[in-house]
């Protein structure tokens, strides 16, 4: 795959200063410009800009070379989607979400492997005489990289064609009538586009080292403000990842994430059509408005009104 990662996102919010303060508390590092933030491995991956309501202004995708840009430009032309070329990038707008996507030549992320957690289990004495590493850590949790974004689209089919047939993403899983999980890297998904009555940014996710850091990171945020809790701790069926959803001052969801199941060229997960019942294997309490609904479905309170 010529595409290899999400490079950065530009996120529009009405309260830039508040969301920037939250992002620092979340563990992102201030970068060279005000309201720009970096991850440990991905460099600068978040820019926060003013907007009337929360939205994803731009999504950056990394590719290898000029030939890749040429192929993507031709594919977008076949779809009837205009793009703007620059020396080392091209930009096009997804018709379903209105998000500007900038495909740019950039270095691949090389991540230092996280330390593998050692567990005691029935019949397995992995760490005799020692406490679990996760309970001894004192340092704050810092995201390793941007994991994925989830977008609401008023034309999910058009958005799916844009990312798959235009940009060259691969599909990992689908929820018929609702969503497609698509990847531009070895992660299970980097972009999820779901059908919605309006275009919006549902959430961003940020990778951490292990499930202890999912819990530690979320717990630290909730100690400062319990109302930030949205959904977690849990584990998704799709992607196999542990998660904890939080909400920022723009009422947008952010997710602390342990890495997804992986797709490799020679060892790919089977693509599945999955249903709502398989969203999570186990999960803590859920706040209203987190879970998407298939086209044509209604909540119980909708039917009673």
Predicted regions and their residues:
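Vicinal oxygen chelate
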Residues: 6-14, 51-75, 77-142, 145-154, 180, 225-305, ...
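The feature marks the first
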Residues: 4-34, 38-71, 77-79, 295-304
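N-terminal beta-strand motif that seeds the catalytic metal site of vicinal oxygen chelate
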Residues: 1-17, 56-61, 117-157, 188, ...
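Structured core of small recognition/catalytic domains
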Residues: 157-235, 241-244, 248-250, 254-256, ...
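Short amphipathic beta-strand/extended segments with alternating polar/hydrophobic composition
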Residues: 47-49, 101-105, 193
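Core segments of cupin and vicinal oxygen chelate
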Residues: 1-45, 95, 151-189, 194
